[in-house]
Amino acid sequence: MLVNFNRKVLLLCIGFCCCSISSILAQETSTEFWPEVDLWYRFTPDWRLSMYLPLSKNIETKYREGSIVVQADYAWGNSRFIEDRRLLDENRETQMKINLTRSGYLITKSLGDKGETFEENMLFFEEHFRTPFKNHILVSHRLRSDLRWIGDDNTFSYRVRYRLIIEREWQAKKVSLVPFINVEPYYDSRYETINRVRYIGGASISWTPRIAFEGNITYQHDTHSSVTNLWALNIILHVFFETTKAKK
């Protein structure tokens, strides 16, 4: 049943992507660069803290934003298949948990003007559901809710997001490569519609338990943004720490 559900969702997303892209190509686009550092600290096999430090820069206008994200997650649930693999945001091969619950807080400000152009505070909650397949293929569903306070007057709104992720690990001696693709529609309460869709393709590579590098190309289509079509190059440095207890 779950395998059939994943196949149906995948086919629907592929059809949605094809229909969306056909109406996009003729429109103007903007390009951005997104460098990021992610710090991970695992203190038990199931519990983990992390901090993201992402930046964004518009190549044409030079506009920049910076964010700080602090979050905690808890992995739980065993698959009927015993799966030992390195996932996108993991430092080493471990027995995979099929569910993950995450919560965190984000602060974003425009840079160079002390947040006068844009400022946001956001509390978010995530649920991840993972389905492993043969040949180290993994299909994940992520449901996320964002509670947002935007601007000087802290105007409240919320978003609901669903992300479908497909990834696969390849190993060669100590090197682990995890290519992936994902698609994510956003529902925004300010517009009472699905106004944004993101398509991402990339890979994560690691050859040591402490460091991993991730690179991806992101395309974003937003019908209610000042920039309707956005292309971004996202480069992420993952740095991992863990206690002795977490390694058991």
Positions of PLM-derived features:
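Transmembrane beta-strands of outer-membrane beta-barrel pores
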Residues: 53-59, 105-111, 131, 145-149, ...
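Residue-level signature of outer-membrane beta-barrel architecture
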Residues: 41, 74-76, 92-94, 129-131, ...
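Detector for outer-membrane/organellar transmembrane beta-barrel domains
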Residues: 129-130, 136-184, 239
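Outer-membrane beta-barrel "beta-signal"
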Residues: 71-75, 79, 127, 229-248
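Membrane-embedded beta-strands of outer-membrane beta-barrel proteins
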Residues: 37, 70-72, 125-127, 162-166, ...
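Repeated loop/turn-to-beta-strand initiation elements of outer-membrane beta-barrel proteins
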Residues: 46-51, 79-83, 96-101, 134-139, ...
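Start-of-domain marker
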Residues: 27-95
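Residues that define the transmembrane beta-barrel architecture of outer-membrane proteins
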Residues: 31-33, 64-68, 119-123, 154-160, ...
